[in-house]
Amino acid sequence: MGEQQLILTNKLLEEMKLQDYQKDNTIYIDEDITSESIELWARQLKNLCNKQLSRPKEERSPVKLIINSAGGSARDTLYFIDLMEYYKKRDIEIYTYITAYAYSGAFKIGICGSKRFAYKHSELLCHQWNKFEYGVKTYQDTVNDRERNDRLYNELAEVIVSNTKITREMLDDYTKHNRDFVMTSKTALELSVIDEIVE
């Protein structure tokens, strides 16, 4: 009985979120980034942005992304960022709000907003992406993987460098020493990772 109630409660919360996002022009990025979660958020983003596109520019409202996520899939993250850029180029403003934390892919989505906000005690984390592999691979497989991995690393680095004051040298140094780049909201503001601290 308890498990059934939990499932019903979760379904009810999801339905409420789906209804509220249209009313508030707000999308909640509040779980791990997977192909499933990104597909949901992408549909919501397209829906909200297309509604704004149907209005005259002076009547448009910004779409808000409320971010509280530990990140996840790098390629799915880049897809969502591409979608954000598509609408930003069409004069749709997308505001990002980092609440408790934004790590990894969520960090990268956060820095791509038209305006970017975090709270006083928010924590942001930028790090090299991780990859999990299984099975036996040939030498050529590993060569091909290295090329793909290098390309993905460069794509992710470009997102960070082009949207903040974090330099490629800083990123490469953290990667070389296998360190996470953890930031307070104050440090994030100094590095142009965010534009404003909400207090």
Predicted regions and their residues:
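N-terminal organellar transit peptides
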Residues: 1-107, 111-199
